[in-house]
Every structure is written in C-alpha cells, then in structure tokens.
Amino acid sequence: TLSPYRQEFVTLAIGGSIGTADEGLTAPVVMVKDVPELQSLPAGAVKGKIVFFNGRMERTRDGSGYGKAVRSRTEGPSIAGTLGAAAVVLRSVGTSQNRIAHTGTLSYNVTSPRIPAVAISNPDADNLERQMRDTAAGGKRAGEPVLLKVRVTSRDLPQTRSANVIAEIPGTDLANE
C-alpha cells in the first residue's frame, strides 16, 4: 500500500491474468467479502478502483471450504471489470499463514473488460484489512483512502509446441517380486 500506511505485499498474478502497464496501476481500494457483496454495491462504487476480495476460506477436513471461496478468484475479476474496477486483489484461497499466496486460474468472461488480478497471502490480507478498517468510519484514520499500487508483468505468449515425457522405470510395478 502507498497510504495510509506504507506496506509492501507479496503478490502473485492469478493464472490467466493480464498485466498492467510497466509503471503499474495506483488506485483506491474497495473491500468486499465475495462476489455477491460486490454485486450488491451501488452503481459506480468500484469504478476506477481496486477491488479487494477479503473472504476467508473456511478450514474443513473435506476441503469443502475451497469450493465456497474460489468463486471470487474464478469469476470475480470479470464481474469487477464489468462494474468498472481497475484491478482485483484477492485474499489467498487457502488457509496457510505463510507469506506466499495460493493462486490458481481465473476465467475472463468474453464480454467483460479484462483487468489485472493478483493474490496476496493471508497475513498480507490481514494487514490490508486492518488498513481498510482504520480508514472506515470510526477508525483512527477515518476518511483517508487506502491506495494500492499493483504492478503485474503477466502477458499472453503465442502458442507453441511442447511435450510431456511419460516413462516407465522397469522394476517399479512389482518391486517386491
């Protein structure tokens, strides 16, 4: 973040995300939990802003929390782009507490503007959430915008030929015989 507190976040581009211009993109942040909350905002609420999807993945034994949380990553950038957002920052869809974000892919809707999308780790998302709360009504920095600068170097490359190697190492199928 550039303001109100200077803080560098570790980001990873979401698979399939477009990049930003070389100088990056700076804009105020709007925090939402998930896609339904984004869609419930008044018209123009995210125009030219960075949407921060802050929904936490629920830790479950069967992994069902992942399915509930992943929509913000897969569909969120297209929906935010349609609403006029400049970029998306996503709380990592995972429960790890290290500073390396979990990513995956997104699916741009062919009729929606494509905007850059990055993931940040849970600890970095916690810091950004605190900054958003500090600047909200009643916070100690109420009224100050949270400004983020995002720089994404992703780009589409032309298709090319590649190959996978599939092999069998003799003796591994029946190793004990």
Task: Indicate where each model-derived feature is located.
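Mature extracellular/periplasmic domains of secretome proteins
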Residues: 41-46, 75-86, 103-109, 172
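Noncatalytic luminal/extracellular "stalk/propeptide" segments of secretory-pathway proteins
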Residues: 1-50, 54-62
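Catalytic-core environment of secreted peptidases
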Residues: 43-45, 49-71, 77, 92, ...
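Protein/peptide-recognition domains central to ubiquitin and immune signaling
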Residues: 1-8, 85, 90-107, 123, ...
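Second-shell loop/turn segments in exported
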Residues: 16-20, 27-32, 41, 61-77, ...
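Long, well-ordered, tryptophan-enriched scaffold segments
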Residues: 82, 86, 108-164
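Active-site-proximal beta-strand/loop segments in catalytic clefts of secreted hydrolases
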Residues: 32-35, 53-57, 90-94, 120-123, ...
